Amino acid sequence: QVIASVDEQGREQLRTGGRFLDWPTSQNEPAINAGLQALVIMSLEAGEQLEQVLKNDSLSSLCRTTVERMRQAIPDYKQSKQSAALAALAGLAAPEQCNEILSEGGVERYSTFYGYYMLQAKAMAGDYAGAMDDICRYWGGMLDLGATTFWEDFDIAWLKNAARIDELVPAGKVDVHRTYGDYCYKGLRHSFCHGWASGPTAWLTEHVLGVTIVEPGCRVIRIDPHLGDLKWVEGSVPTPYGVVKIRHERRKDGMIKSQIDAPKKVKIIR
């Protein structure tokens, strides 16, 4: 069905159900079109890999040739940070070029769900420091207001004159929960505990702690940390063979000293 939705010019023509990326872009048709083009490409690339494992050469080839056709139809991905991030991840545009769009206005026009993909695109561009700063400002903004879990939606502008959510609202302060939200989550219906806003947790493990699973079952793990301006970072990753414990420290000469404790059946690549 997905392959059948791609026309001869390589443009996705998904029409079953609503065309949607996230609520903040729901009125931005060019962004939706660009985002769906990127998502279909990534889906078919994953499909090609799966069919190779299943020895289905004909369907694997069909996925590949469809993606090649789609790459000739470059959408207008510059209409939102969501579509710019997806364009980078799908290989439709240079990550450095997309990062220029993602960096405009700092974390203005970020979104809680696609924020993860924005961080991934910035990492592809080598802008780890910028991504970490965005985490501090955007997700840190929620923490500054008393959050203990991340929210369904957040706009950096909400910080202005805002009361914390863990205290009674003082006179003259803005009640963030009652005042903000949009679409189907206006006012007190706005969730303050939303799993899809937790992307930085995975991103920090992958890029700051530096963990990439290389082989199925976690038999081989690559560790390549990016500390930014942090002096140290510490974390752990569960595997079927036990927990991998990792600590990185920045030495005075700027080099990173790593301490890695891994189960014997897990091979570590540095």
Label the model's feature ranges.
Residues 1-38, 51-89, 93, 145, ...:
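Active-site acid/base region of carbohydrate-active enzymes
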Residues 28-39, 106-110, 123, 196:
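Extracytoplasmic/periplasmic, Sec-exported soluble proteins
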